[in-house]
């Protein structure tokens, strides 16, 4: 059984999570994966570990984790891989990215999830400057 886990960034406002949930519902409607669930990087639940545990408990033998992020960054390159137990980078200096705005990040626990024997975990890239994204940006620019 295959599960798709979409990872959203999360926000103090509901919009971010709601959009990712809507994307998940639309993917579910296409009947490609046995299970489609959402996990949030920060601020909201379910967390990534909660969601991965849920899909494994439901019988998933392959878990495809796909960030619903436009660009690679600290979350997609470090935080999410750490949670998935697949981070291979150097962690010296810890959390050393800086924002030019004042707010405190509320990251969920980044303890790696337990992946049982016999379960395959696959981690995918964020969307990037895909031509389909370009079309959406141009539609928005044209008021569509």
From Swiss-Prot:
EC id: 4.99.1.3, 4.99.1.11
Keyword Metal-binding: yes
The keyword Transmembrane helix is annotated on this UniProt entry: no
Catalysed conversion reaction: Co-sirohydrochlorin + 2 H(+) = sirohydrochlorin + Co(2+); Ni-sirohydrochlorin + 2 H(+) = sirohydrochlorin + Ni(2+)
Feature: compositional bias, Basic residues: 95-108
Family that this chain belongs to: Belongs to the CbiX family. CbiXS subfamily.
Quaternary assembly: Homotetramer; dimer of dimers.
Listed name of the protein: Sirohydrochlorin cobaltochelatase
Source organism of the structure: Methanococcus maripaludis (strain DSM 14266 / JCM 13030 / NBRC 101832 / S2 / LL)
């Amino acid at each position: 059984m295959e599960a798709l886990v979409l990872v959203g960034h999360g926000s103090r406002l509901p919009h971010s999570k709601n959009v990712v949930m809507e994307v998940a519902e639309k993917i579910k409607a296409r009947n490609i994966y046995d299970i489609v669930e959402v996990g949030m990087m920060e601020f909201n639940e379910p967390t990534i570990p909660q969601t991965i545990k849920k899909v494994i408990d439901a019988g998933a033998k392959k878990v495809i984790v796909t960030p619903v992020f436009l660009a690679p960054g600290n979350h997609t390159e470090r935080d999410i891989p750490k949670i998935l137990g697949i981070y291979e980078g150097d962690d010296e200096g810890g959390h050393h990215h800086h924002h030019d705005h004042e707010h405190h990040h509320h990251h969920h626990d980044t303890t790696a999830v337990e992946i049982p024997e016999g379960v395959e975990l696959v981690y995918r890239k964020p969307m990037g400057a895909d031509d389909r994204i370009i079309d959406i940006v141009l539609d928005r620019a044209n008021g569509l």
